Every structure is written in C-alpha cells, then in structure tokens.
C-alpha cells in the first residue's frame, strides 16, 4: 500500500465566509473541474471549520492545513492570511 509519508498534510486555499465565533472561522473552498461525461466545466464548493489565532474577517483569502480533530467540526487550522477578495 503506497501511502503518503507521515507528517504530510493537505493544504487548501479558500475564502472566509463567517468569522463570528471565537478562534473559529468557516472557510469556503471552491473546486473547478471538468465533468467526466459531458465535459462541462463545473464549480463546486465545500465549507470547512478552521481554528485560527490570526485576525481574519469575512472576505479574506486564507490558507488552511489539515490537523488533528480539535472539536466536533474543526479538523483544519488557518496557517496563512493570503489576501482580501474584492
């Protein structure tokens, strides 16, 4: 079984859609792919709950990294503030 080496974690870039909780933000990650049969370009998005110590607000672009379970919903951590989406 060819698995990833220990310590490598998934990293995603998304937009903060909610920053109303303490030390928790909701990040929407958008994925663009071509439909396998119809070949139409499809957009889909998924929301992730992420732990943050940084000061981020709604509309900010952030980089999140997979981590151990921190609560019932939080499995991601904000590692970098990339910019602001206009």
Curated annotation (Swiss-Prot):
It comes from the Bacteria. This is Small ribosomal subunit protein uS17. It comes from Chlamydia pneumoniae. One of the primary rRNA binding proteins, it binds specifically to the 5'-end of 16S ribosomal RNA. The lineage of its organism: Bacteria, Pseudomonadati, Chlamydiota, Chlamydiia, Chlamydiales. Belongs to the universal ribosomal protein uS17 family. PROSITE patterns: RIBOSOMAL_S17. CDD domains: Ribosomal_uS17. Disulfide bonds: none annotated. InterPro entries: NA-bd_OB-fold, Ribosomal_uS17, Ribosomal_uS17_bact/chlr, Ribosomal_uS17_CS.
């Amino acid at each position: 079984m060819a698995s990833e080496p220990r310590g490598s974690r998934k990293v995603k870039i998304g937009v903060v859609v909610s920053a109303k909780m303490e030390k928790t933000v909701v990040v929407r990650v958008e994925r663009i792919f071509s439909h396998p049969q119809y070949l139409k370009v499809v957009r889909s998005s998924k929301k992730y709950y992420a732990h943050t110590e940084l000061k981020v607000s709604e509309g900010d672009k952030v980089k999140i990294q997979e981590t151990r379970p921190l609560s019932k919903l939080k499995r991601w951590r904000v590692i970098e503030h990339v910019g602001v989406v206009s």
